[in-house]
């Protein structure tokens, strides 16, 4: 049921002319991410790298009661469009979300949460920094682990914090659930 709900909602919610096209493979990616949230039903969540809000919408469909703190610097060429699209999605779907418009590398701490999604800076240093920002969060979902720098950051983070990562190939990008 959740998978179908996401498959129906995402294409309608997609930003027009987005360079990141919504296709069946992309939908499966968001379904896999939403399944993690559905399993834990967090009361609070942090999303580092919210861009257009596609993950946020998928998470909301999996756990509508979750309150989200989203962080994004919106520094790319399409950032203004993405930011406005994010605002529309949050309003249209009545998602409990607040956003901090800041480069996460400028942050030294974030509030406590039950779940975190790390999908911000895809460099080794950036991903490692973002993971350490949410180190006290019980469940962390790291995206883009098919990127060697991100995967190494996840592995090094787990080694230094004595946590475990379960990697999943969702057909688009590898995800890591860190517990």
Go through the PLM ranges and name each one.
Residues 2-40:
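Class I SAM-dependent methyltransferase Rossmann-like catalytic core
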Residues 19, 31-179:
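S-adenosylmethionine/decaboxylated-SAM
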């Amino acid at each position: 049921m959740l998978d179908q709900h996401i498959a129906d909602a995402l294409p309608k919610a997609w930003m027009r002319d987005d360079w990141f096209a919504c296709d069946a493979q992309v939908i499966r990616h968001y379904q896999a991410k939403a399944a993690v949230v559905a399993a834990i039903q967090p009361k609070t969540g942090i999303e580092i790298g919210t861009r257009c809000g596609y993950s946020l919408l998928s998470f909301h469909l999996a756990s509508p009661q979750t309150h989200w703190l989203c962080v994004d610097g919106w520094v790319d060429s399409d950032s203004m469009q993405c930011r406005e699209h994010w605002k529309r999605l949050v309003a249209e779907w009545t998602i409990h979300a607040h956003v901090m418009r800041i480069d996460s590398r400028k942050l030294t701490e974030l509030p406590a949460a039950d779940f975190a999604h790390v999908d911000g800076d895809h460099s080794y240093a950036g991903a490692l920094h973002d993971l350490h920002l949410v180190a006290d969060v019980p469940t962390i979902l790291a995206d883009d682990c098919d990127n060697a720098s991100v995967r190494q950051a996840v592995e090094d983070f787990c080694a230094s914090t004595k946590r475990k990562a379960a990697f999943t190939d969702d057909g688009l990008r590898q995800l890591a659930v860190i517990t």
